[in-house]
Structure formats: structure tokens, C-alpha cells
Amino acid sequence: MEWTESIVVERPMPEVQAAIADEHQLMAWSAWPAATGYQCEVEGDGRSLGSAVVFRDSAGIEQGRQRLSAVEADRVEYRLRNNGPGGRLMTPEVDFRLEPVAASRTRVHLDFRATAPLPPGLRQVAELLLGRRVRRLHVKDLEMLKAHVEQAPIRGL
């Protein structure tokens, strides 16, 4: 599975980048906790490389983690480890690329890559079904990021 979804946020790039690179802020806008029913907690300070969001089911069993792996002014990268089809380990990659559209507008691209850990044939079917849901959640993530950042007070005023 591989795709890119994009949105324009009516805020300067540093504000948008901060909302993505700070895992505490990310949890305020992410669509995933509600969609999965998992409890999410930040492990580490939430801003340093290696910090992670840990996803636990209702029994408290870890189902996955999203680790902050790179932060630049125009890019934030997360690497995930989670249970995929049949409980097999998946290692998706989510990169956020940012580009200024104007001084107060930022285009955000969410790049997603993952391979279901299944044999060919079965993998294609699983990725088709799983991919639809995951992609819809990525679109919702971007919409929620936009709402979160645009509702925040403008810095410096």
C-alpha cells in the first residue's frame, strides 16, 4: 500500500510542523484513537526522536506504537510497529511533508507506505480491504489537523 493525501492549512509552516512533531498535540487531533478504540499514551517527552505513541487495547495490551523518527522544518517522519492481519507484525511508514503556500498557509502531504505481511494474492486482497479504511482515516487525520491548527490562537499576537 502506498499513497499520498494532501491538505492546505491556513497557518504558517512552523505552527503546522509543531502540531505534527509534538506527539501530545498529535494525539489531540489524530483520528486513530476514536477509530480503533485504543488508549494512547506518549512514551518519552513526545518531542524527541525515539519518543512514541503507544496504542493499547481495553485490556491494556500493547497493539502498536508510532515512533518519532525524523523532524526537520519541512518534514516529520513516524515509523510504526503494529499488529496487522492475522496478528502479524506490520511496519508502516508515515511521513508528513510541508511546503509553504504563502506566509500564512501550508500545504501538508501525508505519505503512507506499508506492506501487509501475507503471501502474494492474499496480501493484495488484505491491502485492498485494509487500505480503504486506512486511507479514509488519513484523510480524516488531515482534516482534523487542519481544524486543530486553525482553531489555535495565532502565535505572536
PLM regions and their residue ranges:
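Beta-strand/loop substructures that line and gate deep hydrophobic ligand-binding cavities in soluble
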Residues: 80-140, 145-147, 156-157
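Glycine-rich portal/gate segments that line the openings of hydrophobic small-molecule binding cavities
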Residues: 27-28, 38-87, 107, 140-157
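Hydrophobic ligand-binding cavity/cleft-lining segments
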Residues: 1-45
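Hydrophobic/aromatic beta-strand elements that line small-molecule binding cavities or substrate pockets
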Residues: 5-7, 64-70, 92-100
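Short, intrinsically disordered, mixed-charge
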Residues: 18-32, 73, 127, 131, ...
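Broad hydrophobic/π-residue packing in well-ordered secondary structure
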Residues: 17-30, 65-66, 80, 96-98, ...
